């Protein structure tokens, strides 16, 4: 594009900006006519037009490119001719404003009357493009926004409103006058952003003059004005573009999500309909005058069988007895619906739910389980209708407060239904939600690439132009010089632009006044000058001034002094010292806590003074040493000085109230660590990089939040005020409401955090369901799912390799390493010296120096390298060469001496100038290569970590003996020594044998030989597969045994005894296994394998507890806690299961980087934690009335002392919130709760209510403390938690690179072929079900196998689902009957389908899985009809099976071309399944271990908050349920709360637990906190994020696959069509049927008729009998789609081999000819025929004429016989024309039967079908076709014709 547009450029420079005149317009019209004529000509001659595009750098809105120079003032704001060649024949003109921005207008009259030359339009244009105009509009919008945030605006705001409307109207009028309304391009309504303005203004006028009822709803439309900011700020448009793109891309995911949710909701509806209304109702009713026998009859209500029957309480016949009961004035309905009769738990708003199955919740004494009252949460949580079920499942999928739904459902329906939730969380939540992330990330990446490509293009264009201009300039110079020589005068060039020796422009000369120059030269030099200046940040005078003021070189002694100080300040040791000070300072700040002694407080404040002094001194010294000019050139120094200044200011203002926040700024010093901690540095960089891009996104997010907050306030604010009594018992506004803007903003922010359901219930209760659902779900989908995922996408994209390169700006980066290197060197020096002394020889200093090498990278005299050397950046390109060299060296490809960089690598610590790159996802090597990723593939330090090899080796695990390979031996050696690989290794390492020679055993004789035989026997046993299987079985059994040790074990004596014995048996077996392995493998191998170490430690635990039992110490505390470590037993299973081991190895590879990020996150959080301690320590205490659990008002109790004075009553307590900020540790816990959004509400409420230390809190007195949490959530939660995902994904990619992705060495082209072929090879033609011989059966068969039949059945299935969706819990009898009848119809239809298929397909019906499934469903449906009551009572409702039928939709999707996107998503899921299964297994293992641990530690804690009778750690099942809940971090705060009770009055340590001898119900806070935090980090952050990583990865792969021209389905469709043409699955097809076959195929393989010629050109090989093989056809068609390529043949060969191997039954496949040869043969034959015919004709004509002449001469003598002869001959020649076709077809048949490869010579005429190819007989013979055996070039068609 660039090159094409260059020649058409007018030589740039300001002079080419020509005013737009009527002549210009006429010229445009002239050009347009010429262009039209040219196009017409081209069209007639069928010449293709290259597509023309507008130039990207001259788009409207962009700035005028530099090449055009500075436009002179007279062209500013004036219509100019368009510069873009694209518009040369279109009626447009441009206008430039002062900022050189381009505005493009249409040159047609605006509003039909204002031509481009009219005064009015010119004025309007001037106003429109003026910077002040847009500024004014922007300010108006912002002011308007401020007015919109007022919850109750003053009376005069109406007038202001009119003003705003006036301004917007004026703006639109200006635009219309300048641009025109909507007819041509560049008019007002052609810009979608103007639609927004137009609609807003129209709405304003409509609402003003027409009364439309609900004004506030319409007024909310004004909020959209805030969107106008997007039009004014340039960067925002692109982000919004990306957003809109991603929303478009999301359509498929949305459809899939809605579909899956509908299916799940349907299942939920069928399973749990009406369950959530089951409550505990007081029973029997407390009445005196009722007939006692009526309710006291035991058999009637107390009987389990009765109350286990669901149908009883809904039974109409029973209710019909009301009339009888009402005699005794008992109103059943009222009783059942009176909330006073329900059982409520303390502090809950909803009655306790219960269920009638054995594993559901039970009611307390005196209550019965009945269906009564409304559903929980104002009646909004239920499965009673499809829509509520859908909402419940959407909530489950977005994981908002789902633990509540989970607990309610399990309580009402039973714990078995946990499976339902597992499926939905894993499929719905993890998969679908992350697909949304994957799609958004991809859309963003694509958008990004496009932008980059555009920039690249511009850059290239610009470079080309500069080249041209330079040449031009040189030519001018030459011309001038020549002139000067000729004329003898001076060539007086332009003085300001003399070039200095470096070839750069010297801009120091004074500029004259700008003269309007017409030479291109000045434009170029101006442009160049601008470029130069653009590279300098400040104007030149600033540099002069800075040199004078900021560089202090006054006198020689001072300079010397400066140099000394520089040496001191820059010394690595000083750096080390400063770093230590930073760490100590951070520690001091982290030691603050509450309550703190005065002495400790003093120590801390003195410490702070000292550190402030040290840092100030460092800054002052650096300023002296480096001069302010140099000092402030470095970012770190600016940062330092900022913090030091703040610290000093804070000291000065220490006693001013309210400025304690300044103390928090000291915390930023922590970030100075980044200087010497590469990972931290890099993470800060990543965040910095993202913040740039995120700046715009954050603005968009802010605009969205603002709009929704205002909308919420306008729509619902009033309702909250008026209907507040519905949601608050004391009729005061709750904390979360929308009455004012700030609270409305908080609600929207909370929705962005993913918590929308609770606030939505409130909203629905006060303001109606429809509006609230709409607004909340819009915020949820737009804000949370799209914008926040875009956030994540940005972060992930910042993880690109560029940001991972650690910064090399300053040499100081390594100062720490240098210092540490020196210290190591010093220690080594001392060691060597002392050893020398001990050995009695005193080494000279020189010797020691020689033996140790240089001290840690210092120069000769131990000083650090001089400053200038240090700062010099490494040469960029040179580096690259060195890098390549380095790689070659590693692989051994370069000979000659080692490259210097290699030596550097070896002399690693000693090189001070080396920047060490520590990528975030570092490889596992301890030493990083000095080069970046290029060397990763050849990572050298592998051998350094040999001993631990098995851990990282995917297959070898000694302890999983199945694949034991003795390590550390060369494969060749090994092969020589023991051919079977079945000999044990050495027992001990060489070092051991050297130290203790007694360990050496001679195995060739005597005892040694016996020992060797024993070892070999053990080795054989251990290596045997059965042994391995047995051990795995034992591990599983012993792990399973642990699950029985719950709180009931004491009561189950038999089980307990069995377990005790089993435990001993297991221990003995494992000890035996360990001893066997010691003997078999030897200590050396056993103890160098990490998996064996794991086994060893776990067996040790068992041994210790066994010994303790023998000695009778089993009740000792330490022994008991050791016993809990038995929970680790299942870990031994890890090494035995391949799938899990793969995942664990991947995880272990990621651990270093995960730890790195975890550390950095901790540092990040430390800042917020210390800040929290500063803000809230000791302020969360409150005074509470223990009887009512209510907090006293501050009017009653104001502070701690007042509270303590009331304590004598015993009902008052001064207590703290359990999770608080009293010290940094608790601060961390609080932050974790806030970051996972669990339990964060209580912490936030406490913070917002807090006043001062030891003062009673007051409601929302400290409202803006919410902002602390908002900021933390953005930086601490969004950023840092998402970094985990980034790291894990990055790591996955690194590991893939390391373990050799095979695709790395393939070109894109090759990959395409490779993939197509991969798919191709896996398929082969199936034998179709034969068509029945019977006529009727045959007809039915045809009907049943049609696609239409399938699709119509599918539609019926969907309709059946719809009728199931219509069901509700409280439907009328009529509806029940109608649905029953409809259901009957469906059952009959599906039964009919079943019968028809069985009739047509006969016994083959049962060979297809889907058919069997259908059959079972039909049978179940019929049985279900007959026995519905019975089945519903004891089994799952049979309607459920119908839901599974929906899976058949997947089959129909193939037939719909448009559903490709959805199929891609499903394909991604299928690809991820194996990996996800492995991760699921690992997750289960972790859950298992933790639940065993939880049972042994928390079984007896007090039941409160999240722990109750169903959700607890008492039994294994309950523990698993609790842990599954926490896997998504849901509800962990509730489970942790009771465990934080450490003593009275929170819990009772002496409480008796019946049935056991364990006392107390207190928890252990430290164990509890470790337990939950570690579980959350492992499961939530690591395992769940691995899920995300895999899905992202596979989604990308699947998208690539689906975007390939040929996908799996195309091949499947090919074979499906093939089956119809080859019913016997011979894999061959007749050549005659080929044309029909390729015509019936689906796109893209299809070749539509007429396709004869096309098929001939495909050159397909044929076997005897004129048959063609399926693979050949498929290859040819694939080639046709993908285009030809050199790799094709090789691939084809491998594919054929594969196919032969897969199908040994294949017929001997020896092609004898090809379609092309066959055609050539036919053509040859026809030509020979024709030639021969002509020859005959000519002969007979000759003969005839001869005869004629002869007869003339002979006077007719003998004519008759000759006539006969002649007639005969003529007939022979021409008679055949009549039976042309007959002969031809016969000839063809004969030819078909011949198997001769040579050309046929029988004489037949051409067939009609070939006439197209053969010229009519009279024409001269065509050039002969090539002889046999010679190939024809690709253009066969031409040669044939």
Curated annotation (Swiss-Prot):
Subcellular localization, per the record? Cell membrane
Q: Which GO terms describe its molecular function?
A: voltage-gated sodium channel activity
Question: Which residues carry attached sugars according to the database record?
Answer: 214, 288, 291, 297, 303, 315, 327, 356, 1185, 1199
Identify the PANTHER family for this entry: SODIUM CHANNEL PROTEIN TYPE 4 SUBUNIT ALPHA (PTHR10037:SF223), VOLTAGE-GATED CATION CHANNEL CALCIUM AND SODIUM (PTHR10037)
Q: Where is the composition biased (Acidic residues)?
A: 925-941, 969-983
Q: Which reaction does it catalyse?
A: Na(+)(in) = Na(+)(out)
Organism source for this protein? Mus musculus
Q: Where are the II repeats?
A: 554-826
Q: Which family does it belong to?
A: Belongs to the sodium channel (TC 1.A.1.10) family. Nav1.4/SCN4A subfamily.
This protein is called: Sodium channel protein type 4 subunit alpha
Q: Ranges in the Extracellular compartment?
A: 151-157, 211-216, 273-385, 411-417, 592-602, 657-658, 712-740, 762-772, 1045-1057, 1110-1117, 1174-1224, 1247-1263, 1367-1377, 1427-1439, 1494-1515, 1539-1568
